[in-house]
Amino acid sequence: HAEITNYMQPVKELIGNIAGTIDMISEHVNEPFINQDHLDELEKLRGEITEATGIKATHKEGVMHPVEIIETMQKVLTDDTTVTVDVGSHYIWMARKYRSYNPRHLLFSNGMQTLGVALPWAISAALVRPNTQVVSVAGDGGFLFSGQELETAVRKNLNIIQLIWNDGRYNMVEFQEEMKYKRSAGVEFGPVDYVKYAESFGAKGLRVTKQEELEAALKEGYETDGPVLID
């Protein structure tokens, strides 16, 4: 009987071709069955996760709260959309709040935490899943690590929405510095016009400051042939 636990000890060692072994095992596996105790435990864990991540958005004129962004994404994005997430404070919010319901459709750089990974990942996803939408999520700092790859996305006419969480700083570095040193240094950078940046590559550029504007922009991104950047 399966148990929901973090500690799993092997009972048998299977030596041989992995694909062949799995095929052989699959022939002898019945339809999966989860008993009520396990379902109750899963529901309990789901409730704990929901409670732990139940942060409410605080509204400030002209500035979108991370929860507002994610709630809007959750409302507009379809389940077959591939979402690639760059590294930064937005990455923490996305990991805690955004829900994906298809395997391999929500990509994080957990181990190496590679700044600038989201757009190249999105390009790859758009090439291997040409008939679906891809959304790349990055902070303004991380986006500038690989933003020049918009040229590739435009040249290949890929259906990518590039979403930039713009606060004019490396926020993840900033709050870690403040936690450790009680101050921050070298984390701010000057203003960048990301709409004109996108247009200079031939992509569509949009700017939003409200939840309803983001909803409209995401829908426009779905209806547009080729890459769209939303600042």
Q: Predicted regions span which residues?
A:
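Short amphipathic alpha-helical interaction patches enriched in hydrophobic/aromatic residues
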Residues: 29, 53-57, 205
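Hydrophobic residues within well-ordered, non-membrane alpha-helices that form the packing/core
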Residues: 26-29, 77
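Active-site diphosphate/adenylate-binding microenvironment
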Residues: 44-120, 125
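Flexible, glycine/charged-enriched surface loops at secondary-structure junctions
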Residues: 32-46, 229
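Thiamine diphosphate
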Residues: 5-8, 13-25, 92-231
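Short, polar loop motifs at secondary-structure junctions
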Residues: 1-3
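Donor-binding and catalytic core of enzymes assembling or modifying cell-surface/extracellular glycoconjugates
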Residues: 29, 33, 108
